Every structure is written in C-alpha cells, then in structure tokens.
A protein has these predicted regions:
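Glycine-rich, aromatic-bearing surface loops/beta-hairpins
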Residues: 126-157
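Long, low-complexity intrinsically disordered regulatory regions enriched in P/S/T/G and acidic residues
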Residues: 1-12, 64-90
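A structural feature that tracks compact, well-ordered secondary-structure segments
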Residues: 40-47, 55-58, 110-130
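Short, solvent-exposed interaction modules
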Residues: 33, 73-122
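Acidic (E/D-rich), amphipathic helical modules within compact regulatory domains
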Residues: 38-82
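The feature marks the first
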Residues: 2-52
Length: 157
C-alpha cells in the first residue's frame, strides 16, 4: 500500500458497513479529529455515497485538512483539533489499550508493535476502546479482537 493511500482506507473489521458507508469509517473520523470538526452520524447518513467517498478519499496533509475544515464549517460543529493525542504518540502503549485488551482477553500489543502501527491504526484501536465513544459499545468492543488481529498480523513482536 502506498503511503498516500493509508489515510483513506477502510479496515477489514469495518467491512459490515463498508459497502454503503452507513457508518463513519475510522479514516474519516481521524481526519475530522485532525481538522477540528464534529460530524454527527445523522448528518453523515444524510450525505450521498459520492459525498461520503469524497470525505474518505480526502487527503490528510496539513493543507488538505485546513481545506476540509473550511469546507465543513457550515455543516459541522467545531471541536479542538487533535494535537498530541495518545494515538499520535509512539513512546508507550496507552493504558486504555492495555485495559481493553485485558478485559477482552486479548494480548496487549508490546511497544515495538505499537510503534509499527501507522497513525490511523493507532487511532482506530483507541477509538474502539474509548469509554463514552460511539464505538465503545459491546459490538464495537467485539471489533477490538478483529482490529488487533488485522493490524498486528504481520508486525514483528
């Protein structure tokens, strides 16, 4: 996979809704966090498939994220831009990941594995574990083992 394609992919664990994009893919959620916009699920559902694909394929460079924030300022509420979030850090495995893995009887990624994940993969794992997040329900916690397997399958231990 080319580095430029990493920002717009849909993970295998998201396959249940990837055909019609009925839920926001992690790639879109990450870009929204990076540009400081909150898109409600109801608004996402009102978008056409082409509009959803446009957001999915939108670049994640600083310039592209600025353009995305401008484009969405009328339809999305503003939130703090993601800066120095745990998924942007590679110096330690976040405690939330450790807790969620232990609770779901999954092996905890070691530091080397965490460092080998790209930013979108780290973002997805943390969103799947985050309390109070729409992905932290039991069904999404069920996606945690799938995501871990998908992301860590070819990583050096």
């Amino acid at each position: 996979m080319k580095k430029t394609e990493r920002h717009c992919r849909i993970f295998k664990f998201e396959a249940e809704f990837s055909d019609n994009l009925r839920c926001l893919p992690m790639a879109v959620r990450r870009k929204l966090d990076l540009c400081g916009r909150k898109l409600r699920l109801q608004h996402w559902l009102e978008l056409g498939y082409e509009q959803k694909m446009e957001l999915l394929n939108w670049g994640d460079s600083e310039l592209e994220l600025h353009k995305l924030a401008d484009r969405l300022k009328e339809s999305c509420s503003e939130i703090n831009r993601a800066i120095q979030e745990e998924w942007q850090q590679i110096d330690r495995v976040p405690g939330l990941i450790e807790e969620a893995c232990l609770a779901s009887k999954q092996p905890v990624p070691n530091l080397r594995q965490w460092q080998q994940l790209d930013e979108l993969e780290r973002f997805a794992l943390l969103k799947l574990c985050s309390p109070g997040h729409s992905h932290s329900n039991s069904k999404s916690r069920g996606n945690l083992p799938l995501a871990l397997r998908e992301f860590l399958e070819n990583k050096i231990t």
